[in-house]
Amino acid sequence: LIDSLQPVRIFGGNDRREEFQYAVSYAEKYTPQVVGAYLDDGTGSYVNGVYLRKWRAIVDLTADRLLKRVFYGPWYDKQRLLGGTRWVKECYLNFPDLAPEELKSRKDIFPLEREVFRADSLRRLLESLVDAYRTPSDEDFSVAQLYQEYDVFVVLPHSKAVARYFGGEKSYNEAIGKYLKGKGKVAVKYHPRESRFYFDCDASVTVFPASLPAEILFSFVQSKCVVGDSSALLSAAWLMPESRTICLCPRGLDENPILSLVKRVPPVEIVYS
């Protein structure tokens, strides 16, 4: 593909991926000035290398980096910060003002245009992706449901996070239930890796395909209120500025780096459960 296109700019959503790095390094054969461009990929664009367990950070940034460089070759680069590899020159971010100083000092930072994600041409492309993400369990879902207006759109965390931070499914359902009382149309989306339907809701609630990226839904769905966990709400606050955005947060996580980031995004309301 690169042999035929000979691109002058290559975009990627995660510059730590081997495919992106190899594509840029290979393209230099045709265009020495080829530009690697990073597209906002969520919290990793703003939080400098978050690891839930310290041993993962040690393995990821030492042994894993060394082994992959030996296996792939000297072109492979791994950095803690997304957008930070040597193959990236430009970074296109939802919130350029929140970019880490390390990124601002080394890369050219540009704002992403929200209107692009609302364009009809892109929506047609996204509609085709919806069908690609559909699984047998989503047989009752239709693309038309993306264009309906909802009172509340709930983006659910993984059940393991619910058990760890919210005291279990019952407590979490009670916390979410406060925002659903008296509401007409409600939609929910489970975490992509969720295997259990733990959310307590009736048949009137629209359940979006779990495998569908939340960012695609935020490009379509109109909802008066979006409730969910911190990471997904960054995209919601950017793509749905007209909606009330609520981050339901368990107490005791004030020092969480991702939550600290969300607090810097003005439209997002932090509500402790």
Where are these regions (language model features)?
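Short loop/turn segments at strand-loop or loop-helix junctions that form parts
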Residues: 13-16, 36-44, 149-161, 190-193, ...
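Active-site and donor-binding regions of nucleotide-sugar-utilizing enzymes
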Residues: 1-83, 232-235
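Donor nucleotide-activated moiety binding/catalytic core segment of transferases
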Residues: 192-234, 238-239, 262
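A nucleotide-sugar donor-handling region in carbohydrate enzymes
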Residues: 47-49, 53-153
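Catalytic binding pocket for nucleotide-activated donors in carbohydrate/polymer assembly enzymes
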Residues: 233-273
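Short, charged, surface-exposed secondary-structure boundary motifs
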Residues: 45-51, 164-165, 213-221, 254-264
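Catalytic donor nucleotide-activated moiety binding site of glycosyltransferases and closely related
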Residues: 156, 173, 177-210, 265
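Short, charged/polar "capping" segments at the starts of alpha-helices
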Residues: 19-21, 46-47, 161-164, 194-200, ...
